[in-house]
Design a protein with these regions (language model features):
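Glycine/threonine-rich flexible loop motifs
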Residues: 10-12, 105-108
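Glycine-rich, charge-decorated loop segments at or immediately adjacent to ligand/cofactor-binding or catalytic sites
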Residues: 38-46, 132-144
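Short, acidic/small-residue loops that bind anionic groups at enzyme active sites
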Residues: 59, 98, 114-138, 151-153
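Acidic/glycine-enriched connector segments
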Residues: 35-99, 103
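A charged, well-structured terminal subsegment
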Residues: 94, 146-172
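Short Gly/Thr/Asp-enriched flexible loops that form oxyanion-binding sites at enzyme active sites
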Residues: 42-47, 107-117
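Glycine-rich beta-alpha loop segments
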Residues: 1-54
Length: 172
């Protein structure tokens, strides 16, 4: 799961994030994430913790100390951020991307590129809270329309606009 760790995001993002986390906990999902108690990432972590769901924290050694270390059931230490991205993509059952900054975008792009290259065939879900990803989705479409990317994007990722839409992926 990738999302913002900023404490300054608007409430709409935090509310939708908490509702999504509560729904995932209902299905007893495991949280595998980049380890932060702040922002949307912290909201997800705290919701999973409160619901006694399994939490796996993946931290790069190069950033150790810059990120808050959370109380996780498992802690995985990797050498650097690029290793963290690969670990998250390769070891999760699916990737859920919520609004975030550069780290979140790196996770999204890594997930999509690895899927295109056949390294995995896992679901990638973009949670487009408040239209946050509208411009990047237009960019993806432009890549396809102008032949920079010939891959059928409908096979790469799904977009949801409300937390409740995640349920259709849980029932599979």
């Amino acid at each position: 799961m990738g999302c913002s760790s900023s404490n300054d995001v608007e409430d709409i993002y935090l509310k939708q994030t908490e509702q999504l986390a509560q729904l995932l906990c209902k299905y007893n999902c495991t949280l595998m994430f980049g380890s932060s108690e702040d922002g949307m990432m912290g909201m997800i972590y705290k919701t999973f913790k409160r619901n006694n769901c399994k939490i796996i924290s993946v931290l790069p050694k190069e950033n150790y100390g810059m990120l808050s270390e959370v109380d996780a059931d498992e802690k995985v230490y990797v050498n650097k951020t690029s290793d963290q991205l690969k670990y998250l993509v390769n070891n999760g059952d699916m990737t859920i991307i919520l609004p975030g900054s550069f780290g979140t975008m790196a996770e999204l792009m890594t997930s999509i590129q690895c899927k295109k290259l056949g390294e995995h065939n896992k679901k990638i879900i973009i949670f487009n809270i408040n239209g946050f990803f509208d411009n990047i989705l237009k960019y993806f479409k432009k890549l396809e329309q102008e032949k920079f990317d010939l891959y059928d994007q409908t096979q790469l990722y799904d977009v949801i606009n409300d937390y409740s839409e995640i349920e259709k992926y849980m029932e599979v």
